[in-house]
Swiss-Prot record:
This is NAD(P)H-quinone oxidoreductase subunit H, chloroplastic. It catalyses: a plastoquinone + NADH + (n+1) H(+)(in) = a plastoquinol + NAD(+) + n H(+)(out); a plastoquinone + NADPH + (n+1) H(+)(in) = a plastoquinol + NADP(+) + n H(+)(out). It is found in: Plastid, Chloroplast thylakoid membrane. It is a peripheral membrane protein. Keywords: Chloroplast, Membrane, NAD, NADP, Plastid, Plastoquinone, Quinone, Thylakoid, Translocase, Transport. PROSITE patterns: COMPLEX1_49K. GO terms for molecular function: NAD binding; oxidoreductase activity, acting on NAD(P)H, quinone or similar compound as acceptor; quinone binding. NDH is composed of at least 16 different subunits, 5 of which are encoded in the nucleus. GO terms for cellular component: chloroplast thylakoid membrane. The keyword Translocase applies. Its main location: plastid. Belongs to the complex I 49 kDa subunit family. Its EC number is 7.1.1.-.
């Protein structure tokens, strides 16, 4: 980083990678003129694990447990993108019941992600009480996940052609009860936070992003919608069964940290609407397309070799990726999560390029914090909502 040429004595401060407000192993080299930020340089890569290269040496079903380690607070979305790509390459039809259950799980995961953004964001700017409130509601969401998938996090629930298991007995009633309860809690959040004058002083007019600027930087998700651009892939691409439900895109015009907070808060209410409609209209039928497990062994006799008969040596793939390329995307809680996938007629992807929303959204941070106060860095970074697992991959 070049030191700005000025007549003043500037101070260079390292924030992170262990600072609690960095939300992971993010390091910021901040140049200060007193309390004013002159420059900021993010240093990434502390959590890089080579996720794209690992994908090239795994069958899709083997790779599914890895993808939940990208954004480990919204694992359903990383699983969804991992199975949606091969499904589109192979023209695999997903049963309607499986599609509805996927939507329910995705929206519950969106609520859990937004809740775990809200608590630490409020703690960053000095409000401790909401931090404990959101963990109470988040526990209910994780109880639902545990009942349906067996895991509170890292669910490993999605499969090519459907899901791993059907919903257990009594789960739908339990989820409907949670929806009714959670709507009342969102009203409590609004009373506790939205009208708080100290909170408004910290976030209003801080980190403003214009609509054109947001598009030029490639921002997505609440970062884009808070800048006056009503763009949501659930409406644009109509993946899964989102076009069968009535809900509205939540967006704001101001483009500041308060607008991003309001977008995420109202998105949780819209997610509850989608979940309630999906639960009430949940169709019957199978939860998985079993034909997707078929594999043409005549075309590749190598898979019949002796070593492939033992899973400890070489596991035989159960799905073949056709020789074509595809970009597939979903609307994750943090923005557009995309995969550029290239198949080459084998069980392993030839290329697996990840488009993480947090990494793209983080690029605008140096522009937002310049000419702001040092204390505003926590507010702006918190409003972006990043998880270093998906930023570094």
């Amino acid at each position: 980083m070049k030191r700005p040429v000025t007549g003043k004595d500037l101070m260079i401060v390292n924030m992170g990678p262990h600072h609690p407000s960095m939300h992971g192993v993010l390091r910021l080299i901040v140049t200060l003129d007193g309390e004013d930020v002159v420059d900021c340089e993010p240093i990434l890569g502390y959590l890089h694990r080579g996720m794209e290269k690992i994908a090239e040496n795994r069958a899709i079903i083997q790779y599914l447990p890895y993808v939940t380690r990208w954004d480990y607070l919204a694992t359903m979305f990383t699983e969804a993108i991992t199975v949606n790509g091969p499904e589109q390459l192979g023209n695999i039809q997903v049963p309607k019941r499986a599609s509805y259950i996927r939507v329910i799980m995705l929206e519950l995961s969106r609520i859990a992600s937004h809740l775990l953004w809200l608590g630490p964001f409020m703690a960053d700017i000095g409000a401790q009480t909401p931090f404990f409130y959101i963990f109470r509601e988040r526990e209910f969401v994780y109880d639902l996940f545990e009942a349906a998938t067996g895991m509170r996090m890292m669910h490993n629930f999605f499969r090519i052609g459907g899901i791993a298991a059907d919903l257990p007995y009594g789960w739908i009633d339990k989820c409907l009860d949670f929806c009714d309860y959670f709507l009342t809690e969102v009203v409590e959040y609004q009373k506790l936070i939205t009208r708080n004058p100290i909170f408004l002083e910290r976030v209003e007019g801080v980190g403003i992003i214009g609509g054109e600027e947001a598009i030029n930087w490639g921002l997505s998700g609440p970062m884009l919608r808070a800048s006056g651009i009503p763009w949501d892939l659930r409406k644009v691409d109509r993946y899964e069964s989102y076009d069968e439900f009535e809900w509205e895109i939540q967006w704001q015009k101001q483009g500041d940290s308060l607008a991003r907070y309001l977008v995420r808060l109202s998105e949780m209410t819209e997610s509850i609407k989608i979940i309630q409609q999906a639960l009430e209209g949940l169709p019957g039928g199978p939860y998985e397309n079993l034909e997707s497990r078929g594999f043409d062994r005549k075309r590749n006799p190598e898979w019949n070799d002796f070593e492939y008969r033992f899973i400890s040596k070489k596991p035989s793939p159960t799905f073949e990726l056709s020789k074509q390329e595809l970009y597939v995307r979903v609307e994750a809680p943090k923005g557009e999560l995309g995969i550029f996938l290239i198949g080459d007629q084998s069980g392993f992807p030839w290329r697996w390029k990840i488009r993480p929303p947090g990494f793209i959204n983080l690029q605008i941070l140096p522009e937002l914090v310049k000419r702001m106060k040092l204390a505003d860095i926590m507010t702006i970074l918190g409003s972006i909502d990043i998880i270093m697992g998906e930023v570094d991959r």
